[in-house]
């Protein structure tokens, strides 16, 4: 059981998001989660759709250094390409026709906490470049803005495809891949966790 050795009294909401499983592959994923949680390292969860990558990301946040900070989740595949930059980095008033007021992006909303970027392989190359800058410099710039904004955010990403293949195909930046792949964690599918099926 992944949650058996976690001090629940120190984890807000941790009991509601316990990760339970006995299969060796699942136990290994939980072990890697506990090992990286106290650090500020960027984590990349890899696994098929439906294996619980967001649940792992939330548990990582709950047992990490800033559990009381915000946890902001973004499904990158669900955001139209034309809006992804303004959603992630915010927008200044007048940046485009419908921008009638300035608005924070997900990075600013996650300041002091965790930003979970699901289906990260779907980001445009332009958005990937801005994300790389945010990871390297700890700052962002809103769409239509000229001022840099410092953000203190732990970025956690997830993908259901092998990003190495995306890099080879020219669809994903190699430098961003290396920034995200600091601590990869593969989440096994249920068919690979036969010991857990009776649970």
What spans do the regions from the language model cover?
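Basic, polyanion-binding surface patches
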Residues: 170
């Amino acid at each position: 059981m992944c949650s058996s050795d976690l001090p629940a009294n120190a984890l807000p909401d941790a009991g509601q998001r316990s990760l339970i499983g006995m299969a060796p592959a699942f136990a290994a994923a939980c072990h890697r989660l506990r090992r990286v949680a106290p650090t500020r390292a960027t984590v990349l969860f890899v696994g098929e759709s439906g294996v619980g990558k967001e649940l792992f990301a939330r548990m990582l946040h709950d047992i990490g250094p800033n559990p009381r900070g915000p946890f902001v989740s973004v499904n990158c595949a669900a955001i139209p390409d034309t809006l992804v930059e303004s959603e992630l980095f915010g927008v200044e008033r007048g940046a485009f026709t419908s921008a009638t007021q300035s608005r924070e992006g997900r990075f600013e909303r996650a300041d002091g906490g965790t930003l979970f970027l699901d289906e990260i392989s779907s980001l445009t190359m332009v958005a990937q470049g801005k994300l790389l800058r945010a990871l390297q410099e700890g700052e962002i710039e809103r769409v239509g803005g000229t001022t840099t904004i410092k953000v203190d955010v732990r970025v956690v990403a997830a993908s259901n495809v092998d990003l190495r293949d995306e890099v080879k195909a020219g669809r994903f930046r190699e430098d961003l891949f290396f920034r995200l792949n600091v601590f990869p964690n593969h989440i096994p599918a249920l068919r690979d966790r036969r010991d857990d099926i009776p649970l």
